[in-house]
Amino acid sequence: MERWAAPKVTAGSARRYVADQPSFSSTLLDAIYKSMDEQPGHGGGATGVEAVAAAAKKQHEAALHYGYYYKPSLAGSYRARAPGPHATTSSSSECSSYGGFSSSEAESSHHRRLRPIRTTVPGGAPGPAPEKKAKKPGASIRAKLRDLRKPASPGARLAGFLNSIFAGKRAPATPPSATAGAESACSTASSYSRSCLSKTPSTRGQAKRTVRFLDSDTESLASSTVVDRRRVPVEAVQQMLLQRMEMESDEDDDESSDASSDLFELENFAAIAPAGAAYRDELPVYETTRVALNRAIGHGYGHGRSARVV
């Protein structure tokens, strides 16, 4: 086989070659004519015809292979691009000993250029600063309400509680002002995550309060008098308890005497009875305090009979 130097193939030439691709019959006729020119005086034998057919078939397969890989759609993508310094082109050609037809393949790869990084600032006067929109009073209230919804950490709560305690101890005693603001925002010194809106109560229809400043001696004396008034004497309490106990004991004695009045009493009738009476033998026993029964018992003893009423 004889290798021919193929010209450089570009994207445009490859497209034109694909458009002008010969058919199988034309390549077969070209191969037959060339074989006849190479062997003058000899008739086309069977071996010559087979060789020509094999060469034509091989050329046709090469043409189909080239047409498959180099389509017009692919060639059109290279039309707008010019081969740059980074483009590489490689070509290879094959030719048969039986004909002058040659097939070439070309591959070109283009590397995209990277955009340069801007390292300089374009000179010129800076543009006007955007105007700040005026804040509405409603926006601040909404922001405070959003802060109320945010959860506070336990450390911030503890710090705020301690700061409020120490601030209350250090603050001097000042009279409450009657004309206070209607609404005031209060927040701790350590954390601004929580805020509350407090409204001072109105002082209309209430009694006026007065504040007096006293010296340390006067203040101690006033406090001692108040304590003495509140203190109850111990001796008075003891006397009251003793009187109460005596009254209770007297009531108990009265109740016991009333209960003993129903019991029997023994009287010595022998001292007043005449001599030789029956009272000397035994004493009358009264088991009741009823006067009618006592008289009946005494009447029975007066007749010389001894009777015991059960």
Swiss-Prot record:
Q: Does the keyword Manganese apply?
A: no
- The UniProt regions of compositional bias labelled Low complexity, in chain numbering, are 90-106
* Identification of the protein by name: Protein BIG GRAIN 1
GO BP terms: auxin transport; auxin-activated signaling pathway; gravitropism; positive regulation of auxin mediated signaling pathway; regulation of seed growth
Where in or outside the cell is it found? Cell membrane
Keywords from the UniProt entry: Auxin signaling pathway, Cell membrane, Membrane, Transport
Q: Name one GO cellular component term.
A: plasma membrane
What is the role of the protein in this entry? Involved in auxin transport. Positive regulator of the auxin signaling pathway involved in gravitropism, plant growth and grain development.
Please state which protein family the record places this protein in: Belongs to the BIG GRAIN 1 (BG1) plant protein family.
Its domain of life? Eukaryota
Q: Where is this region: Disordered?
A: 81-141
- Gene responsible for this protein: BG1
Is Cell inner membrane among this UniProt entry's keywords?
Answer: no
